[in-house]
Amino acid sequence: MKIRLHTLLAVLTAAPLLLAAAGCGSKPPSGSPETGAGAGTVATTPASSPVTLAETGSTLLYPLFNLWGPAFHERYPNVTITAQGTGSGAGIAQAAAGTVNIGASDAYLSEGDMAAHKGLMNIALAISAQQVNYNLPGVSEHLKLNGKVLAAMYQGTIKTWDDPQIAALNPGVNLPGTAVVPLHRSDGSGDTFLFTQYLSKQDPEGWGKSPGFGTTVDFPAVPGALGENGNGGMVTGCAETPGCVAYIGISFLDQASQRGLGEAQLGNSSGNFLLPDAQSIQAAAAGFASKTPANQAISMIDGPAPDGYPIINYEYAIVNNRQKDAATAQTLQAFLHWAITDGNKASFLDQVHFQPLPPAVVKLSDALIATISS
């Protein structure tokens, strides 16, 4: 399987941070987390002095940080959390450069990434998923698609929606002869990381060999294909482009539905087709809690659960375990602990269609949070 290694921006003054998957499916990376001078009990309350925590990165996580930030500030008025949706690649780059406290990411750092940048950690915050949407006026059914067919659509070998390969998955559906217009992210994106892992796993001899997967890949040059910035850009671009197919983070499910986009049932490794609802996401995630390593770098794509949705993931805070001062370190610990406990309640997660971390994974996240120091 070809893995694209993505060098992150000139903002990094040290060795380049490589955004590559270290494993796929049930063979995750393993290893121990970096520990710092602050290893021990997690701070559950922030410092009493005014502290601002800066977050940037994943547009999939951005709506959740927009819920978490004000709620934490209401509880602790001396703490301000700023959030920006810039894409996972930018979030990781800025966390590595030390320009933000939290780099939000749908993609995990591999062992190689963490070895190159001592102190950077993956801290799982919640469980998310990715949907595949399309713009086909007159088609009301949830079309069935799988990774091999989607790979052919993104490679340009399936050119129209009435192609026999799509029709074979959707008997009885009146498919139009509309041209397929693949949409992909133009920014470094954890959503691209997830989607291209799915294509690579289900089409290992095709997409898996080239272009492979990563936060940025060389998408095939397909006539009419479009690049869009962020999940919001993907929703808007697809809504304005009949025939489009697009991969979009589940926190934008409501926006996609409001714009009239269709939502696909995706095929998993058992040959079952599912929508990304709470039941199918939780079923897929259940088998990974005991397999999650201490450094939390694990692919959850297309796992073995027959009733599991195939594109799920942990959403991560990419954090350096050394912060600029004790007040920032304490406050960052307190906020991240709150995020995986109180912040994992349905009152927050249901608004973005996320699922809570299993208790075993909360313990792993807390162990990493406890290492944050100054």
Swiss-Prot record:
A lipid is attached at residue 24 (N-palmitoyl cysteine). Induction: Transcription slightly induced by phosphate starvation, part of the pstB3-pstS2-pstC1-pstA2 operon. Strongly induced by phosphate starvation (at protein level). Also shown to be only slightly induced by phosphate starvation; results may depend on growth media (at protein level). Glycosylated, probably with mannose residues; treatment with alpha-D-mannosidase abolishes its interaction with concanavalin A. Phosphate binds at residues 58-60, 88, 106, 185-191. Disruption phenotype: No growth phenotype in phosphate-rich medium (3.6 mM Pi), decreased phosphate uptake in phosphate-depleted medium. Grows faster than wild-type in restricted (Sauton) phosphate-free medium, even after nutrient starvation. Decreased growth in infected BALB/c and C57BL/6 mice for up to 5 months after infection. Residues 25-48 are annotated as: Disordered. Pfam families: PBP_like_2. It comes from the Bacteria. When used as a vaccine has immunostimulatory properties; it stimulates the differentiation of unrelated antigen memory CD4+ T-cells to produce IFN-gamma, IL-17 and IL-22. Keywords: Cell adhesion, Cell membrane, Cell wall, Glycoprotein, Lipoprotein, Membrane, Palmitate, Phosphate transport, Secreted, Signal, Transport, Virulence. Residues 1-23 form the signal peptide. It is found in: Cell membrane; Cell surface; Secreted, Cell wall; Secreted. The ABC transporter complex is composed of two ATP-binding proteins (PstB), two transmembrane proteins (PstC and PstA) and a solute-binding protein (PstS). Belongs to the PstS family. This is Phosphate-binding protein PstS 1. It comes from Mycobacterium tuberculosis (strain ATCC 25618 / H37Rv).
